[in-house]
């Protein structure tokens, strides 16, 4: 499911093993790609840093899959569990969306009114998991890593660079965490005064460092974990736990595997759909 109540456009581009994206020419034509994200939590991805920030190179948000209809038991990730309430919410929403498409103006007005009533009946989106806004989202990370591969390896003529990290486009990451966001990110976060700036030359490596600094477990964040496992067109070169973090703050120096779960890292609040899942314990205990 994409960004609009008409899912026809999205499903036309993502079907039968085909995945198409509409990408800004500037991102492909540039000699060096520079990414300048804020450091925030994210309802669909856990965190939004460099890898998630590449949604910005897209030219039409309705080409981007955000979640898959249903529950994990149905092969979806819209809701965690299949209940009569989630069934009723999904069925009612689908009916209203079709009405909005069939009756422009009237249908759209009805949909807006129904959303207000639905909030009372099914719960506020800032407290109730829906639309893939939880740690079981298995769609958004895939879309984001596709975009990263396109920017790293895509050529203006539609072909790709050799599938070797050494051939990827030069890339610089500067993460603004001076005032970031925690809790219900990305749109309604609480301020996070981490007062840090992270930088590096690989988006997955910098995102891994950001996750550890935030006090989270990389193995529980698919968008970061899977970036280190990407095949075909690699995004990262090594095991994330061996990446060295170098900081002017001595307690933050060391391999990410050793720093994960350290009390020296920040203690931050995840999005409510990720609370109790994403937080790190000491990495050596986690591995054991």
Model-predicted regions and their roles:
Residues 1-288:
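Extended, low-polarity segments enriched in aliphatic/aromatic residues
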